[in-house]
């Protein structure tokens, strides 16, 4: 089989194996996960000793625990990952969740997780695609998901004009796949508004 990087770049192979692989390439996620797994286990052990945990899904990393342990442990983790995997922390994409203000000792460059809604900051974050935070934060992000699905349904309607049965089959399959995940993992009271909005759009 031809290297995927060559297929994506007009037959020209770029880089060395040690420099990584193409983002979005099918094996990239698995290779990434294996590459930093030893360091992830060490990080988890450190925070687990004080009641915390470190979990990762592909390149999404979540660490919880007392700030005086989490912040130094995360800095050590990223220093080791940089040395072993040549991966750098993107601080602009790293957030700290707190119900109140940013905790004392928060490393520079890390923002508070949440969204500004109607002039009020609502703490929250996305955990494996599921919004977690204040009720306002959760409902806002579920509404965004419904609008995303609605845009896709509109595209289906535009492409399949006049094909009623095909439109219903594809639109239903698409919405079920997109929203079932949220239906199974969000509180029913949070999903109710989003589900009613989806019903109205359909």
Please place each PLM-identified region on the residue numbering:
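Nucleic-acid-interacting cores, centered on viral/eukaryotic replication and modification enzymes
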Residues: 1-202
């Amino acid at each position: 089989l031809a290297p995927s990087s060559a297929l994506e770049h007009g037959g020209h192979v770029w880089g060395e194996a040690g420099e990584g692989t193409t983002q979005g390439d099918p094996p990239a996620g698995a290779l990434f996960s294996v590459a930093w797994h030893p360091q992830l286990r060490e990080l988890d052990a450190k925070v687990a000793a004080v009641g915390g945990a470190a979990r990762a899904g592909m390149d999404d990393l979540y660490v919880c625990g007392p700030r005086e342990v989490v912040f130094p442990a995360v800095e050590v983790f990223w220093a080791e990952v940089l040395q072993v995997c040549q991966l750098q922390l993107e601080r602009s994409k790293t957030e700290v969740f707190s119900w109140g203000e940013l905790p004392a000792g928060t490393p520079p460059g890390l923002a508070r997780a949440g969204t500004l809604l109607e002039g009020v900051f609502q703490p929250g974050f996305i955990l494996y695609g599921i919004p977690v935070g204040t009720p306002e934060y959760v409902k806002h992000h579920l509404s965004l998901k419904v609008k995303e699905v609605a845009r896709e349904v509109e595209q289906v309607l535009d492409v399949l004009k006049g094909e009623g049965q095909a439109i219903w089959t594809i639109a239903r399959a698409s919405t079920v796949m997109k929203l079932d995940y949220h239906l199974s993992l969000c509180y029913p009271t949070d999903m109710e508004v989003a589900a009613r909005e989806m019903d109205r759009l359909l």
